Every structure is written in structure tokens, then in C-alpha cells.
Amino acid sequence: MNGRIRTFLLGVSLLAGSGWRVSAQEYTGITGMMHVPTAEMAPTGTARIGAFFLNGEFTPAKLTYKGGKYGTYNHFLAIAPFSWVELSYVSTLLKHPTNNNNVQKQWCYGKDRHFCIKLRPLEEGIYWPALAIGAQDPTRTIEDKSGDYAYFNNFYVAASKHLDIRGHELGVHLTYRYYRSDFNARWRGVAGGITYRPAFAPNSRALLEYTGDDVNVAVDCYLWRLLFLQAGLQNGRYFSGGLMLRIQL
């Protein structure tokens, strides 16, 4: 069985090509793990267009319809104009009740739109980690901590260090996040995780992360140097994942 897995990953690596390495994207288009941001950065001069399915357990507690959580989708456009900055624009579908008497369709979709930014003031060195600061939906204002529309509003600082072990890469990531809205309090505080990139499949990666409330596992890879795929399980049960097209500007 181990031989079959190794053969599969090697095939994925060959499809991806040897010139591009995976730099996993979180669901906002900003480089990170699955839910937790890191101090890694996208290649300079690249744009990324993608879409993700977000399980109801993956989204803020306030995203409910008739008292229940629901799965949704988002899409984003992200750019990395310089080695030290990333920007993205994210649109997420929201489920709302309709205002008419159409019994055939009692709900409709709205959208939450917001910007994300990440800055890396310190690049990774031999003896020190990379450091980054960032924000998701930083321009959102809330009158109180119930934060009716501040679904994703948060700020963070992250550190990342990579170790080379006989050609295999092990990444260690530590993040502190502050979500302003009380309904996202479960994600306030320390988060982090580890990433592993095998020597025989350098464009593929596995990760394990702790969000402050959940433990997530995921795998991702690049195919044909352009198409990024990520699939993960929240607490080993709830699937979220997506795809992204990366373009060199």
C-alpha cells in the first residue's frame, strides 16, 4: 500500500512540473494552511483566481439559516505584486430568507465582500523564522461585539520556519489571531500547525493545523504548474476544499 501511495504522489509531482512548488492557499486566496494563516508568501508577480466550498462547520457561527449552519462557496482574486505583500478580494455566498410569498423558493443568496492583506516585514533566514502581519476584512466597522456583518473580520501575526531533512521539507507555523466579533471567539488566540513536503513530490504537501478550536488535516498540490487543488477535513469529519488558477503577471 505504501508503494502505491508513493507512486501516486510521484505521478502528481511529475504532472505539476519541477519548476513550481506548492505554496498552499487558505480559502481567502492569501498564502497559508487551510484556515490558519502563515508567514509564507506567494511568488512575486503572480495573480490567483479561485473558488472554495466551505462546510458549515468551517464558517463563522453567525452564518446560519433558520437556526442551522449551512455549507457555502466563495471565490477570490489575489495578487502578490512584491515579495513582501499579498492582497485579495473575497466574495462569499450568504443564505437569506426571501421577502416574497414564493413557496417554491423560501431563500436566496446574498454576498459578503471583503479585502485581505498580508505584509512580511522579516524574511526567513537560516536561524530565524519569517514574520508576517495581516488582516481579513480590516475595513469592517462594528458598533458592538455582536458584529452583525463582521463575519470574517480578524487581525493576526504569524511566524514560519522551514527545515530541510534529507530533501524533505518540514514547516512549523505559529499564529496569533484576534477576531473582533464574539461569535468568532473560538478562533481568538494562538493557532498553528506543521506542513510536510516530500522530496519525491515537491509540488505536493500535507498539513496538520490547530485553529484554536478545531484540528484540521489537508493535502494540496499544483498540477501543470497552474492549477492548485486543496482538500481537507475539519476535525476529521467535515470536508472543505477548492481550486485555484495561478498566473504569472
Where in this protein do the model-derived segments appear?
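Cleavable N-terminal export/targeting peptides
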Residues: 1-30
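Small side chains
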Residues: 11, 17-19, 50, 134, ...
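A generic beta-sheet turn/junction motif
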Residues: 163-165, 210-212, 236
